[in-house]
Amino acid sequence: VDVILISLPFSEPDILVQPLYDESFVLLIPKNHPLATKKEIEQTDLDNENVLMMGEGHCFRDQVIEALPNINRNDSPQASIRTMTEGSSIETLCHMVASGLGITVLPESAAIGARERNSALETRPFAGLSPSRTTALAWRTSFPRHKAVDALRTAILSSTLNGTTKS
């Protein structure tokens, strides 16, 4: 692998990292879900909801857990947000939400895409300062093709990715 897209934070020796864009997290819900009547979602609105998550070891799962301190984890039995079901990919989580198995938190670009592909889905932003992540390019310091990295960065930054803002 020469160059990767990765969510920050990411720190490895001899790896260069260049932020590309920031992206808010939003809630993906079925159109008929009670939370669909709300314009914005408070974190307390998720209390006692079945929030579908990525499986253990996935960086996005860790980002959601950090953003939602009430998420029910093994080390936090008092948490009020339940996570009973896990998916292996963002696409799987979208299908699970469309099937009525629960709700999920997604990067906004993924949630917009899911909503555009499936009219049974809705997205809602979080109230106040929304949880977010930064996506970056990363490559080895010894990688000799710097112009290739520059061309990739330029191509990504010149494209329109709904739900993101350039870093």
What do the predicted segments below correspond to?
Residues 101, 121-166:
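A late-sequence structural motif
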Residues 15-31, 39-47, 126-135:
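Short Pro/Gly-enriched coil loops immediately N-terminal to beta-strands
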Residues 7-8, 53-54, 75-89:
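Short beta-strand-to-loop elements that line the ligand-binding cleft
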Residues 50-75, 145-154, 159-164:
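Secondary-structure junction motif
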Residues 1-29, 93, 98-101, 121-124:
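Short beta-strand-centered segments that line the small-molecule binding cleft or hinge
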Residues 8-9, 31, 57-58, 108-110, ...:
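Short secondary-structure boundary segments
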Residues 1-7, 86-88, 105-107, 111:
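Short beta-strand and adjacent tight-turn residues that come in two discontinuous sequence segments
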Residues 26-28, 34, 52, 103, ...:
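Residues embedded in well-ordered beta-strands
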